[in-house]
């Protein structure tokens, strides 16, 4: 047999003890013994008289001796078990998509999946009683966005009547509800459904999901106490998009005596509100209260100025340092709106809102703000002129706001660069620290007593209320178990730190994609454009799976490893790896940057535009269910398109104006 003779694929049935291949008038009998529960291997026949497994990447070399040579007629044996598909190439197979979370990622998914895919079964689960994600669950006093309101919008939505430059949290929550109603998404959303367990079923290529939900109320008076316990349900999915984000898990700070306090103790992430969802009623009787606020991050810098005029006395306990920035893009906003300077509270007037009702003016306003915001990337790179300039500006700004108590600057103003931590506008925070009824306390807390806070120097503050504004669990240790191939858990895979393929997916966890997962956030700027692009990327993957009858898709280990190496090298050039405590580094001063995307906003948009399909491993569905004989071209179907087979629709659609790409003629 010539040495360059082609390999001939041969498949062997589990229930067969031999496979006969006829070639060059000779017959080859291959004796094989395969256990009934074993996976059916697919082999290639080589010219050296051996069979080798076709499946690459498992690192296993195997061969079976042949009793004779081969010839081209063995192709017939290779196709044993293949059955031509009966569907047209453009008939999409039924496809089940489950989205976890009804925040902005889930809302975008609800809009785009149904817009861009056909024949799908979509369900969006959320543990909360309403939509909005972090904007539903976070309701603390003063909650607001930290980027301009008109930049924190979906690209295809135009809200012109925001009340303030930094949109209040309740307004954002109402906006998410409006979008859900506009696009009729509640038919896909199931509230009060909390994911507790997800496991990938390898034979079927589906995720098996367990969720906890309230048990349906009983109509009988004799219902037992167990009837009020939550019930567990199961669902399955061909494709999962987890949009849980990093601001959905919180815990109490590790301070001695926290449970001993006899007064009221609150966490910013679990603030009690009335039915309207606004926080004002919860602090209505605090006028005679002594309140302690623990923290100086973005949450604390919103709570302190909000509570200061509403309480008798306020103590702000601060452990670390942080930069407080001027109004982000405030000068740009003022210039477009025609103001001489940014107003103190940055609220929009009726005149402003009337201007913004004009579609062309609104487009100019929003485009100007976002262009300016996207020009700030060099602030995050060490040693750049823009980085040095911003540090000087922030220092001048903070000192100008602390003239009454200038000593605070020594404890609050950092030595690290302005973007080592996420930029904190904190409008009104520095001014609140100057108030006579506020004590800035830059000392460590020793413990909480029954009546207040004891510091390490022995000082004790009597308090009526303690507010813990101590952030979130940003370790990506999700509150539900995710089990991939071979019983591997996502928690184990993310130890000692999360590793992903471009922040979206992980090897060993097929058909599981993430929005706002590890390394997907920015140090400054709006996250919504990222969420949109992550969802759109996930849809491209899901469409490919549906169209090409792919059972599973997952990134190659080498691709995950290479992205991890890129992360390591990129962040060495940035301010993010300086010595500062940040949630980017899971609350540590030094260590791995797990929260941020390695690049700019525009960089991530470009990254997600065109998937690199060569970075993925695939498994295909069997052409005959249960045969164990997948064929990558089964999706070609019966050789027809739907319209020509049924003699319906446009049979020359490629000539439509929206399909023809007319090239320009060179001059």
For the regions a language model picked out, list residue spans one by one.
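Extreme N-terminal leader/targeting segments of oxidoreductases
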Residues: 2-97, 115-119, 218, 233, ...
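Beta1-alpha1 glycine-rich phosphate/pyrophosphate-binding loop at the start
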Residues: 58-73, 95, 99-100, 104-189, ...
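C-terminal, flexible cofactor-proximal segment of oxidoreductases
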Residues: 64, 323-326, 354-360, 499-500, ...
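Rossmann-like dinucleotide-binding core of oxidoreductases
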Residues: 77, 87-94, 98-99, 104-121, ...
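Feature captures the FAD/FMN-dependent oxidoreductase FAD-binding
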Residues: 163-248
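A conserved short coil-to-beta-strand element within the FAD-binding core of flavoproteins
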Residues: 191-207, 438-456
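Core beta-strand elements of the Rossmann-like FAD/NAD(P) dinucleotide-binding domain
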Residues: 227-239, 286-287, 456-465
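Central helical "cap/lid" subdomain
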Residues: 255-265, 451-503
